[in-house]
UniProtKB/Swiss-Prot annotation:
This is Aquaporin-11. SUPFAM superfamilies: Aquaporin-like (SSF81338). Glycans are attached at residue 148. It is found in: Membrane. Keywords: Glycoprotein, Membrane, Repeat, Stress response, Transmembrane, Transmembrane helix. A motif (NPA 2) lies at residues 207-209.
Amino acid sequence: MYTQIMTMYPLLISILHILFIISICQLCRYVSNVLVKHSLARIAIEEFICAVQLCATNFELGVITQIYGFSAYALGLFFCSFTYTFTFQDGTCDPSECYEKFCKREMSAREAVLRATFSIMGAAVSYRFAKIFWSFGLMATHMDFYKNESCDASLQVPVLIGLGFETFETIVNRLLQNMRHYNMLISAISDVCITFFGLFVSGGYFNPTLSFAMEYGCQGLSGPSFFLVYWFGPILGSSISLKIAKPLLRIIEGSDEAKVEVVDAKAHSD
């Protein structure tokens, strides 16, 4: 029994950290909603909070992966992705999504730039935020992460191949988001699947905000390579999805409508 408890202890601490992050971010949202009246200011604050929550929880998922492996990482990512869908409010936490909404005239240029800027700012401080909990030293791995200031790049292939992966992942993500039956469960499952598709190639981020927190400045990845793969890739993917989403989804979802019409026709004939 003692051995089992000690085996699960790090997982319980990591879960506690993730819940701590979510709770602090939710508290900040509540305070912002009560005190901040200016719409653009609230948008900026929400993007900042979303970025901190997204990136800080992913840092803790790295702890879980190191101790329990990638199966535990998948479960943790599913849980975190599920929480993002009902805590992010109107936040995008993704500059490439802001770009896409601007192109679709769903967002002004001013708002898109504001959201992207504060999202990146949130990503920039998220590591320091995660280190606050790690500094408590509740387990040895937390202390290792707290003391370690360096990281190795996730990109395991040539830059152009990494660019292709990040672009393709973004296209798939956008297509799913535009489907009629898209919901929180599909969002969480697709996040896990798309991430694992590129996890051992480029890291599977398909989000400039998250990749900025996790990859920028890591050993083995130059600045130009980072921006080409992890920023231009998602923006290119968003641009392509703008062109192909409607006709492709019309074919995919239109087939369901055709089946319904066939069933109705058979019912009437009977």
